[in-house]
């Protein structure tokens, strides 16, 4: 398929006037060595922008040779930059990542919650440290990333929108952005679908064309999670108990489990109980007990709502009254119709139209009205 085909032109479409205006604007694209940022850089070029790349190293791997991916990712990013004829800057944000993301990540696990480091990483690194560095040190008018999201406008009222590809939409991870940050950010692949991204990369002959998507912890990579966490937090094994109080096994440490988890519990057949699988329904931090229940539809797994705090609204306005909208309590979840009620300036109560399974403290509740991501908060507690 030729890169000047009608199909591709839909990806790159820019009016003659906009193209001329773009030629005076500098964009720094965060290049991770993946296919999404690679194609994003190319699309920006086609839209007329002055494009330069930035590779961020945010994890020191001196003692981590088994999982050293940063060098390979940098090589891929440099290869793509050379292929596209753009400059690639390098920056080390490891100190910022440790102080502002990873220490919080550990503290949340230690407190028995299940955090989402990608959300905090976007807040503190990609759209704070990166944005500030690009603007102040590199003279950027915009930054760009390979996230599958869109924005509504190029001004202070910019809204964050879901990505065009519903299967890849990443707005859940970006709800902490303000409309000012959205206005200063470009998301080229948010306007197209993933198969087209890979097709463009293939036709360009980019080394990242067939590179698999990363699924590990933000910037740290794909590791054996239990072994990795044990290096930083001492495990405290304890009992696994049913909601009725019967001991049915031993756990390796509460931090290794999340609500709704079924696999990896190590509970065999228990005399007097059915063969239905066990699910984690609660963590008793005081007594170091993991509480389980049988059956996917067990009422112990269900929540009628949640309490959330650490709120971030994209327009940075607080909710003054009740709000009808939809919510996601985890990535890739189907939207849940709900009512949001302000408790005070820092806390909200969310009531689901239908009870939901495995609402997990530490994860984020992200709110939507149609295509617009309104913002969200961190789940503090379930409502039963």
Swiss-Prot record:
<dbReference type="Pfam" id="PF20259">
    <property type="entry name" value="tRNA_Me_trans_M"/>
</dbReference>
<comment type="similarity">
    <text>Belongs to the MnmA/TRMU family.</text>
</comment>
<dbReference type="GO" id="GO:0000049">
    <property type="term" value="F:tRNA binding"/>
</dbReference>
<comment type="function">
    <text>Catalyzes the 2-thiolation of uridine at the wobble position (U34) of tRNA, leading to the formation of s(2)U34.</text>
</comment>
<keyword id="KW-0820">tRNA-binding</keyword>
<feature type="region of interest" description="Interaction with tRNA">
    <location>
        <begin position="330"/>
        <end position="331"/>
    </location>
</feature>
<feature type="binding site">
    <location>
        <position position="56"/>
    </location>
    <ligand>
        <name>ATP</name>
    </ligand>
</feature>
<keyword id="KW-0547">Nucleotide-binding</keyword>
<feature type="disulfide bond" description="Alternate">
    <location>
        <begin position="121"/>
        <end position="218"/>
    </location>
</feature>
<dbReference type="InterPro" id="IPR046885">
    <property type="entry name" value="MnmA-like_C"/>
</dbReference>
<keyword id="KW-0694">RNA-binding</keyword>
<feature type="region of interest" description="Interaction with tRNA">
    <location>
        <begin position="168"/>
        <end position="170"/>
    </location>
</feature>
<dbReference type="InterPro" id="IPR004506">
    <property type="entry name" value="MnmA-like"/>
</dbReference>
<feature type="binding site">
    <location>
        <position position="146"/>
    </location>
    <ligand>
        <name>ATP</name>
    </ligand>
</feature>
<dbReference type="InterPro" id="IPR023382">
    <property type="entry name" value="MnmA-like_central_sf"/>
</dbReference>
<protein>
    <recommendedName>
        <fullName>tRNA-specific 2-thiouridylase MnmA</fullName>
        <ecNumber>2.8.1.13</ecNumber>
    </recommendedName>
</protein>
<dbReference type="InterPro" id="IPR014729">
    <property type="entry name" value="Rossmann-like_a/b/a_fold"/>
</dbReference>
<dbReference type="GO" id="GO:0002143">
    <property type="term" value="P:tRNA wobble position uridine thiolation"/>
</dbReference>
<keyword id="KW-0067">ATP-binding</keyword>
<keyword id="KW-0963">Cytoplasm</keyword>
<feature type="active site" description="Cysteine persulfide intermediate">
    <location>
        <position position="218"/>
    </location>
</feature>
<feature type="active site" description="Nucleophile">
    <location>
        <position position="121"/>
    </location>
</feature>
<keyword id="KW-0808">Transferase</keyword>
<feature type="site" description="Interaction with tRNA">
    <location>
        <position position="363"/>
    </location>
</feature>
<dbReference type="InterPro" id="IPR046884">
    <property type="entry name" value="MnmA-like_central"/>
</dbReference>
<keyword id="KW-0819">tRNA processing</keyword>
<dbReference type="GO" id="GO:0005737">
    <property type="term" value="C:cytoplasm"/>
</dbReference>
<dbReference type="Pfam" id="PF03054">
    <property type="entry name" value="tRNA_Me_trans"/>
</dbReference>
<feature type="site" description="Interaction with tRNA">
    <location>
        <position position="147"/>
    </location>
</feature>
<feature type="binding site">
    <location>
        <begin position="30"/>
        <end position="37"/>
    </location>
    <ligand>
        <name>ATP</name>
    </ligand>
</feature>
<dbReference type="GO" id="GO:0005524">
    <property type="term" value="F:ATP binding"/>
</dbReference>
<dbReference type="GO" id="GO:0103016">
    <property type="term" value="F:tRNA-uridine 2-sulfurtransferase activity"/>
</dbReference>
<keyword id="KW-1015">Disulfide bond</keyword>
<dbReference type="Pfam" id="PF20258">
    <property type="entry name" value="tRNA_Me_trans_C"/>
</dbReference>
<feature type="region of interest" description="Interaction with target base in tRNA">
    <location>
        <begin position="116"/>
        <end position="118"/>
    </location>
</feature>
């Amino acid at each position: 398929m030729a890169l000047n085909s009608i199909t591709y032109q839909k990806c790159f479409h820019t009016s003659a006037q906009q193209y001329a205006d773009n030629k005076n604007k500098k964009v720094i694209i965060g290049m991770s060595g993946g296919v999404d940022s690679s194609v994003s850089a190319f699309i920006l070029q086609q839209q007329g922008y002055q494009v330069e790349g930035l590779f961020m190293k945010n994890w020191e791997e001196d003692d981590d040779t088994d999982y050293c991916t940063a060098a390979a990712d940098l090589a891929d990013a440099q290869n793509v930059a050379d292929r596209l004829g753009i400059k690639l800057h390098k920056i080390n944000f490891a100190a910022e990542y440790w102080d502002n993301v990873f220490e919080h990540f550990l503290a949340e696990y230690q407190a028995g919650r299940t955090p989402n480091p990608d959300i905090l990483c976007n807040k503190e690194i990609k759209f704070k440290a990166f944005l500030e560095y690009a603007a102040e040190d590199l003279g950027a008018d915009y930054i760009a990333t390979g996230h599958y999201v869109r924005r509504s406008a190029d001004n202070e009222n910019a809204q964050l929108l879901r990505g065009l590809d519903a299967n890849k939409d990443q707005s859940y991870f970006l709800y902490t952005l303000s409309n000012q940050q959205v206005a200063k950010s470009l998301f080229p692949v948010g306007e197209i679908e993933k198969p087209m991204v890979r097709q463009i990369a293939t036709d360009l002959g980019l080394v990242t064309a067939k590179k698999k998507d990363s699924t590990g912890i933000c910037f740290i990579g794909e590791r054996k999670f239990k072994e990795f966490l044990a290096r930083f937090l001492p495990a405290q094994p304890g009992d696994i108990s049913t909601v009725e109080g019967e001991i049915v096994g031993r756990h390796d440490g509460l931090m290794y489990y999340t609500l709704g988890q079924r696999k990896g519990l190590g509970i065999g057949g228990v005399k007097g109980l059915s063969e239905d699988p066990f699910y984690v329904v609660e963590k008793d931090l005081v007594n170091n007990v993991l509480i389980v229940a049988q059956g996917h539809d067990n009422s112990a797994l269900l929540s009628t709502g949640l309490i959330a705090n650490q709120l971030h609204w994209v327009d940075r306005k607080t909710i003054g009254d009740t709000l009808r909208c939809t919510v996601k309590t985890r990535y890739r979840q189907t939207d849940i119709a709900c009512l949001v009620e302000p408790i005070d300036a820092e806390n909200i109560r969310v009531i689901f139209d239908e009870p939901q399974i495995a609402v997990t403290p530490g994860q984020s509740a992200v709110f939507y009205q149609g295509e617009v991501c309104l913002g969200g908060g961190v789940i503090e507690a379930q409502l039963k």
